[in-house]
Amino acid sequence: MKQLIITADDFGLSSGVNAAVEQGWRDGILTCASIMPGATAFDQALTIARRNPGLQVGLHLTLVQGKAVLPSSQIPDLVNEAGEFSNNPVACGMRYFFDKGLYKQLKQEIEAQIQRVVDSGIPLSHIDGHLNIHLHPTVFAFLTELMPRYGITSFRLSRERLCHNLRFDRERRAGKTIERIIFGALANHARPILKELGIRYAGEVKGVLNSGRMTEGYILQIIEGLSDGLTELYFHPGILPDTEITRRMPDYRHADELAAIISPRIKQRVAELNIGLENYRGDRKEYA
């Protein structure tokens, strides 16, 4: 049996993202959304989540290219005076690994992001990360301590088959190869620890190598070759015009990704292939 988790990232980033998430849940195959607690439209995202209780919400942990939850005075080595993390993921990754002086502030911010969602009353069941920062070895070590404490039972294990991806999209071959090596190694490190903790994860995650380009045509191709078991597809849907979306991700095809989520062709093909739609809790979504 094949099952699909369909997730929208960046929930709370902007009104355009939030509107797309709600439309994807109501009219499409979306089953989950990953929320950014420090983002400007976080409160609006909570309102949408409350009026759509079947939509499962996870934490989109943000430690790069975004805003912190804690005040800058409390984590001055992580953010600038405006409370913003660096926009350079490589520099962040190196600092978070080698600079042990950051560890206390880093753990405080990670827990604060979890706590902000928990305090909202929205059930929080899974964790992923902006630019997959949740797999960073230092960050992951803190998460393995915090997830059991907060009852978080699922985790995005960001690994994707390179050969399957390149069969349908041969752009960025060098970049995808590097990403596959890096995230593959990080996933291999995390997997046995997640197993030991009893944390659920999908066998494969689609969206790692085609982030921002999860279009209808691409999705129709890749669902034909899904592995048995649980697969997650993650998207970055948005409704334009939206200055926050285009400022942060000018090359992402947000409208096309929303179109894929609500595509009647994709919904029909998923049903024909007898692929189940569910969230990380295992709740099934019925075909409309």
Predicted regions and their residues:
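Terminal accessory/targeting
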Residues: 2-5, 15-126, 137-288
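Conserved strand-turn element in the central/C-terminal portion of the radical SAM core barrel
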Residues: 129
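DG-centered beta-turn motif at the end of beta-strands
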Residues: 8-11
